[in-house]
């Protein structure tokens, strides 16, 4: 819930900034003119989600800890931090890239008309805030958790993929479960190294 609200806050701030830009500028023809370069754009989302993603990754690391003595929160945090780049990349592919693609299409569709572009931007951000965030944020949280769990695995640890028979159907999860016990750092049959499938 918190991650969803944080993401929606970034989207709202970003939309307001874009609309201000469109009111006070010459014709906008490039994506960078309204949201900045991709790396800069991605940092806004990664920064907003970082505390929640770190907590999810640490929880994942804690879930697969198998030695007799529970490591300190610091040790778990250090292990999970090794996955932060991969988690950030998932945020980019889940939110930033699709959003940039939609905005880029809107710029092309507006053909230099800032008023038309403003209308299209409102539609894009409304869709993201009302629909896409809710569809995307759970996968991001699950991926952070899964990456945290992956961080504490060693190549000699045996792991099995389990799926919830009462949960939604997932062919990849079922295929992965058929592989049985595998070395902890090996990819499952579908290519996944961690949940979710």
Question: What are these model-derived regions, one by one?
Answer:
Residues 128-197:
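Acidic, glycine-rich two-metal-ion catalytic cores of nucleic acid-processing enzymes
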